């Protein structure tokens, strides 16, 4: 990666709440997330969060930067369904790769 480019770390999870992250619950709940806590201690804790109505819609919105309605992914899709990302829909990975980022 070229010098001067910021690191981008995405942590995406499914079906958790703020109290599942120990940096937020500060020992009140049972689960521990030491690696996320380490990141939080050197940065910032967010107080607001937003989500789509389903995990599929949330992933589609993040991957494409578009409202899930535009790409037809409002709820969990089924194998063989017509809805889904099309070749014309660029993804965040496709847009970052030409700028020197390693993407998966």
Per-range role (PLM):
Residues 1-104:
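Formylglycine-dependent sulfatase
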């Amino acid at each position: 990666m070229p010098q001067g480019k910021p690191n981008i770390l995405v942590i995406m999870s499914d079906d958790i709440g703020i109290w599942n992250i120990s940096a937020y619950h500060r020992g009140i709940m049972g689960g521990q997330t030491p690696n996320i806590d380490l990141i939080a201690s050197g940065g910032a804790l967010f107080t607001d969060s937003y989500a789509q109505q389903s995990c599929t819609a949330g992933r589609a919105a993040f991957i494409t930067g578009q409202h899930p309605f535009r790409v037809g992914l409002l709820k969990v899709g089924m194998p063989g369904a017509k809805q889904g990302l099309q070749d014309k829909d660029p993804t965040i990975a496709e847009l970052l790769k030409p700028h020197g980022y390693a993407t998966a």
